[in-house]
């Protein structure tokens, strides 16, 4: 049996998170100043694949050289074009894994991890799993275990003393690109998937960003429609950089509104500032969020579980932190996340 450092990695559609096992306990690994590492991978002008904040900086000025969601790219295709260069998608994931291993090794001040646990989307088939394994091998990782994302989330969040074997839980996972709903049964050794996982592969945090951006555009247009339309139609490099900056502010607004009731998006020029409130956000996406809760309930019922029989609902994914989601889950299922 391998000994030494164990590293757990979750490459999400928006961010990559990781943890290391220390004395039998998992400790979160800081991959960026604010914790998780952005999922984006970019090609530098000297041909290197960059990850994290360095990749995000390139994406802001040269979006054609960036892949914002390498995990989704790995699922959908064998290769992508960054700038004028064709890159195998397994190389994108390998670049992310190399960076995570580097941070884990620096954190532990010892040898590289002896064991690596990688999460994989629960809906993935053998082909996608094989590509993920190939990416890990390309990154120099040989002792790799793959774990379905909802099981990994349950292991991370569950209180071992609070769940009896046979208890049923739900995992509500709203990532950057997709929504997944999974029902799990607690076992003496962990968790098992119960029934067929559900979800929506076309709805995630990115769609929420799009909806919120339209709300900002509507407000900006009412202030100075001519200036806003000219700004958003500007195809120049500086115009594209401004578009990226505004979109980044919209994403920041969505994240901030999980803990505050209002946030300002600074457009500049004659448009000035646009204030967005939590009520604005919730009103804009209420129908979409209700649909995700309905899908979670449908998934549970198809697995033979009534919502009231769920012992827990675990929230996973950055956009799952939107307060309205917890309120809707309690309202529609009777279970408080």
Regions found by a protein language model. Give the residues of each.
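Hydrophobic alpha-helical hairpins/lids featuring a short glycine-rich hinge
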Residues: 82-84, 90-97, 122
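Short, acidic loop-to-helix structural element flanking the phosphoryl-transfer center
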Residues: 93-102, 292-298
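Transmembrane alpha-helix boundary signature
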Residues: 104-108
């Amino acid at each position: 049996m391998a000994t030494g450092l164990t590293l757990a990695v979750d490459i999400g559609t928006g961010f990559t998170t990781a943890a290391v096992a220390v004395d039998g306990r998992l400790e979160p690994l800081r991959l960026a100043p604010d914790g998780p590492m952005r999922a984006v991978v970019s090609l530098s002008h000297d041909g290197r694949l960059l990850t994290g904040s360095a990749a995000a900086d390139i994406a802001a000025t040269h979006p054609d050289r960036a892949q914002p969601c390498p995990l989704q790219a790995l699922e959908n295709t064998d290769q992508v074009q960054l700038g004028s260069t064709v890159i195998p998608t397994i190389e994108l994931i390998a670049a992310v894994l190399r960076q995570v291993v580097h941070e884990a090794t620096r954190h532990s001040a010892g040898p590289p991890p002896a064991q690596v646990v990688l999460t994989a989307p629960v809906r993935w088939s053998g082909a996608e799993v094989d590509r993920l394994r190939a990416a890990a091998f390309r990154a120099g990782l040989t002792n790799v275990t793959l774990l379905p994302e909802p099981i990994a989330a349950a292991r991370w969040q569950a209180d071992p003393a609070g769940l009896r074997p046979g208890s049923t839980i739900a995992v509500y996972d709203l990532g950057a690109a997709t929504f997944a709903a999974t029902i799990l049964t607690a076992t003496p050794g962990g968790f098992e998937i119960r029934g067929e996982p559900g979800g929506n592969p076309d709805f995630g945090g990115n769609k929420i960003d799009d909806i919120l951006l339209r709300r900002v555009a509507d407000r900006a247009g009412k202030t100075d429609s001519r200036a806003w339309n000219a700004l958003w139609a500007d195809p120049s490099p500086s115009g594209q950089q401004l578009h990226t900056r505004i979109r980044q502010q919209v994403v920041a607004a969505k994240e901030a509104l999980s803990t505050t009731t209002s946030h300002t998006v600074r457009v500049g020029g004659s448009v000035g500032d646009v204030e967005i409130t939590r009520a604005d956000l919730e009103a804009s996406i209420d129908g979409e969020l209700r649909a995700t809760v309905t899908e979670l309930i449908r998934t549970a019922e198809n697995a033979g579980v009534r919502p009231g029989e769920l012992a827990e609902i675990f929230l996973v994914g950055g956009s799952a932190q939107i307060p309205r989601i917890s309120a809707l889950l309690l309202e529609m299922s009777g279970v408080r996340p």
